[in-house]
Amino acid sequence: MTFEDLRQKLKSGEVSSKELVQEKINRINELDPTLNSFLIVNTELALSKAEHIDKQIASGDHLPPLSGIPIAIKDNLCTKGIKTTCASKILDNFVPPYESTVTKKLLNAGAIMIGKTNMDEFAMGSSTETSAFGPTLNPWNITKVPGGSSGGSAASVAAGLCYGSLGSDTGGSIRQPASFCGVVGMKPTYGRVSRWGLIAFASSLDQVGPFANNVSDAAEILQVISGKDELDSTTVDIPVPNYLETLSKSIKGMKIGLIDNCFDHEGLATDVKESVLSSASLLENLGAEIVNISCPRFNDGIATYYVIAPSEASANLARYDGVKYGFRAEDEQSLIEMTSKSRALGFGSEVKRRILIGTYALSAGYVDAYYKKAQQVRTLIRRDFDDAFKKVDVLLAPTAPTTAFGSGDNIDNPMAMYLSDLLTIPANLAGLPAISLPCGFDKYGLPIGLQLIGNVFEEGKLFQVANQFEKAAEVYKNRPKTDFTL
């Protein structure tokens, strides 16, 4: 059921907003003790707002587009008066005094914030296993991870606990869990959506975007949250097009480039490769021209990212010292001891690992060899994309090299965990928009994600291609069973 379907049902009185919210709360109470996709459920607040919207509907008031629709928020987005933890012990009791720009825009559009979702601590992870509040499980198979870092946002949509959600994407944290959970996830162009109120991981890479069960709903959410924000100097003052108008456009004559580097990688699972290539054939049948294209430095993205992102994290997370807010170690005899102990006890092992990597990369004697060199390679990766978009409209690749891996399989193997973002990281380094949507299933019935990458501020083209594929393939109509048998 799309947002448009929900609007019609609300307008006709076939269903009330309170009934929609109560149904999702009941489902959360039934299923989330197993999944652990939510950290906070705003039961009273959500029902109260739903009642208010129902009164407005009954009065015939003109309402904004998302009125009465329950949407979940990743717990690294500040929500005024509602605890925001970043899934970390160090922020366990942090209640923001202000609202992030994107959540404010959603609320102004009438959306009902049903809760805050679980995530990898400080968005550092690819499996939602590094959360201080326990891992999230994949609703398609609870022995598998949902991906990360936005695993709670993806799993909650896939399991029908909300109609859409917000996540953040630094190296693939929207697209990879979207792939693992069989939903649509969009990472916008860097600067399209405000980061004001997003708790920073890597400021030159972070971007907020939507999860939804279908392309049109993802387009609606992005439409609402996009645009210039005076509170975020990195947002760009470029008009936001009407994404919904692009959905019905034919893709006949569009050039779509298969990034050949992706399909030659030894870590790419056979089921994933076959499904994505089959998807390319379907797009060709819909009128697109499919061409092979090379991005020579595409596979250098992961090494580049794991210098730049930890370096920025090292600087951004220096503010958590136990002094003004967050977790504070007790009974220490000096400020240095208190700060050291607060950080040692407050941060989890993966966060500490990345802080150490970043601090090392920025240290005297190594900054030229690592950080500056990584920034140079980042520029070369962007140039490869620039060259590619002179020849094609959209690029096509798998979202992830594999389907969802087993819970616990990679938690003690950082390199294996990091490689799951191999195919998503380049778009972040180049600041490009990219979308993941379900395109098939592996032999075990786990979802496979198709990734489309666009040129800067061309989210509309991605929605256009994605929607035409979605309508033709109808993969999105398959939903996970929720008896959660092993």
From Swiss-Prot:
Record's keyword annotation contains Protein biosynthesis: yes
The reaction(s) this protein catalyses: L-glutamyl-tRNA(Gln) + L-glutamine + ATP + H2O = L-glutaminyl-tRNA(Gln) + L-glutamate + ADP + phosphate + H(+)
GO biological process: translation
GO cellular component: glutamyl-tRNA(Gln) amidotransferase complex
PROSITE patterns: AMIDASES
Alphabetic keyword roster: ATP-binding, Ligase, Nucleotide-binding, Protein biosynthesis
Active site: K74, S149, S173
Bilayer-crossing regions: none
MF-aspect GO terms: ATP binding; glutaminyl-tRNA synthase (glutamine-hydrolyzing) activity
EC number: 6.3.5.7
Enzyme class: ligase
Domain of life: Bacteria
Family classification: Belongs to the amidase family. GatA subfamily.
PANTHER family cross-referenced by the UniProt entry: GLUTAMYL-TRNA(GLN) AMIDOTRANSFERASE SUBUNIT A, TRANSAMIDASE
NCBIfam families for the chain: gatA
Role, per record: Allows the formation of correctly charged Gln-tRNA(Gln) through the transamidation of misacylated Glu-tRNA(Gln) in organisms which lack glutaminyl-tRNA synthetase. The reaction takes place in the presence of glutamine and ATP through an activated gamma-phospho-Glu-tRNA(Gln).
Name of the featured protein: Glutamyl-tRNA(Gln) amidotransferase subunit A
Species of provenance: Prochlorococcus marinus (strain NATL2A)
